[in-house]
Swiss-Prot record:
<keyword id="KW-1133">Transmembrane helix</keyword>
<feature type="transmembrane region" description="Helical">
    <location>
        <begin position="571"/>
        <end position="591"/>
    </location>
</feature>
<feature type="modified residue" description="Phosphotyrosine">
    <location>
        <position position="312"/>
    </location>
</feature>
<dbReference type="GO" id="GO:0006909">
    <property type="term" value="P:phagocytosis"/>
</dbReference>
<feature type="transmembrane region" description="Helical">
    <location>
        <begin position="450"/>
        <end position="470"/>
    </location>
</feature>
<feature type="topological domain" description="Cytoplasmic">
    <location>
        <begin position="398"/>
        <end position="416"/>
    </location>
</feature>
<keyword id="KW-0333">Golgi apparatus</keyword>
<feature type="topological domain" description="Extracellular">
    <location>
        <begin position="523"/>
        <end position="535"/>
    </location>
</feature>
<keyword id="KW-0967">Endosome</keyword>
<keyword id="KW-0472">Membrane</keyword>
<feature type="topological domain" description="Cytoplasmic">
    <location>
        <begin position="557"/>
        <end position="570"/>
    </location>
</feature>
<dbReference type="GO" id="GO:0001666">
    <property type="term" value="P:response to hypoxia"/>
</dbReference>
<feature type="topological domain" description="Extracellular">
    <location>
        <begin position="24"/>
        <end position="281"/>
    </location>
</feature>
<keyword id="KW-0597">Phosphoprotein</keyword>
<dbReference type="GO" id="GO:0007155">
    <property type="term" value="P:cell adhesion"/>
</dbReference>
<protein>
    <recommendedName>
        <fullName>Transmembrane 9 superfamily member 4</fullName>
    </recommendedName>
</protein>
<dbReference type="GO" id="GO:2000010">
    <property type="term" value="P:positive regulation of protein localization to cell surface"/>
</dbReference>
Amino acid sequence: MATAMDWLPWSLLLFSLICETSAFYVPGVAPINFHQNDPVEIKAVKLTSSRTQLPYEYYSLPFCQPSKITYKAENLGEVLRGDRIVNTPFQVLMNSEKKCEVLCSQSNKPVTLTVEQSRLVAERITEDYYVHLIADNLPVATRLELYSNRDSDDKKKEKDVQFEHGYRLGFTDVNKIYLHNHLSFILYYHREDMEEDQEHTYRVVRFEVIPQSIRLEDLKADEKSSCTLPEGTNSSPQEIDPTKENQLYFTYSVHWEESDIKWASRWDTYLTMSDVQIHWFSIINSVVVVFFLSGILSMIIIRTLRKDIANYNKEDDIEDTMEESGWKLVHGDVFRPPQYPMILSSLLGSGIQLFCMILIVIFVAMLGMLSPSSRGALMTTACFLFMFMGVFGGFSAGRLYRTLKGHRWKKGAFCTATLYPGVVFGICFVLNCFIWGKHSSGAVPFPTMVALLCMWFGISLPLVYLGYYFGFRKQPYDNPVRTNQIPRQIPEQRWYMNRFVGILMAGILPFGAMFIELFFIFSAIWENQFYYLFGFLFLVFIILVVSCSQISIVMVYFQLCAEDYRWWWRNFLVSGGSAFYVLVYAIFYFVNKLDIVEFIPSLLYFGYTALMVLSFWLLTGTIGFYAAYMFVRKIYAAVKID
């Protein structure tokens, strides 16, 4: 094993490369060149709220509709995310200004919301919903200007410009509810270099919106659907009274600005919203701490093991050595098959399947191949990869099951293919029923659910059987010592050798390596933020693998020194101890970061958190188990057994 100083140069090199790739991405779609006055279509994606975690499609609210509603054909990831991309009546032409235009106005008459529609709109506003639109596949953002210096002199104020995804549906003030019924679109274009005799073309590079609430009496509309906005701040906001009908105008304006931003870097606005400096320093701190702690643990184990092996291999002192307590005394029982070997091998096979899927997804995303402009690509790739990685999960499970003296390989293969996926599908189906009851677009449609079942039983299950068949036929792992026929009596264990204490101790270091990254992941999942720091995530994943492996080795070493040879299940459970801290952090995040108070959103949060914790336990438990298994085989192969 290498020490921390041996790892440090390579770590710095890897970190420098990852810092370069963390902000790199392949755009994913070809650029669209627009000519002057070409139509730029604005589409709606969905409505989201971090308070309810229930997305809704755009026309679930009484917005103005075009003459023909057309939904975009979506991939698997978009459907699972709750996206329902649909056209809107906004008429936007390239580099053509619009001061004010009225939507869905007939003969200069305002829109009338019924009592039921008013109640629904008011409810969505109080639930803090955001509206998400796209133009040329670029999501709309609301500019926020924050001042870090509160000095009265405006010249001394430092302005920090940030962007918020989407725009707020409305706002509340003194128990009154107001709707943002006017949208001021600001689109930025980049002029492409052309030959002298060719017409200029433009590319959309940023899409902003300024939402406003303007009451009916302050808007002046004519029969040509044009309108006049009130000057300055003389207007009052458009109130929505949920107890009666409400009349209002839906209006919008369009403003174009030329920008130096090139099309290839137009997503930088959305991918640099988080405080990157804090993120970098936290990651560097985790890297340094974990590698040095891992180096210290490695040196302790190496020195202790060298001393033990040297003592055990001295022929003159062999009798004295056997009278002492130590890990060699359990050599005849250390490879004794555990209880429920089929379930253990099945869980480890699913862990291998998860490990391969996560490693490939993070690596491919780090290289920039899963662009945010390719909506749903990340989730679609993850789903298909998990299905196809079943062959590796089945192979590893089959070989381990044979090593543990198992004989019913067909039943073992079925268990591997259905145990973990069945739990995931069951939980998701129950949660989906609640989402269906709320008429949310986040509910997986029945055809998509059937397609997922077909992928499970048509791709994953046959591949697991195939891998399991070849793994079971392959030569089992060669254990260096024979197993005694009569099990050795296990002495009474100290309190700190308790399984739960081991879980708490073993989970601290791996969780400490990743909890900062976990905050950004939770923000992306539960607060509708973009996550694209996959370079850092890849580095954290490598650190997680190293720390899980070394902690697992330390824990199994101390267990064997205590003459407890029942390490198979214990090591799998203890190595996944960081999942317990993930659960604790999820509860902390729910209480302190989210404003969820209703039952169904809370159920969704903890249901998906349970899936996350289960998957993380399988992942880290599998990593630790195989590291410990290799370690145990190595140390018992290094000593002389009579």
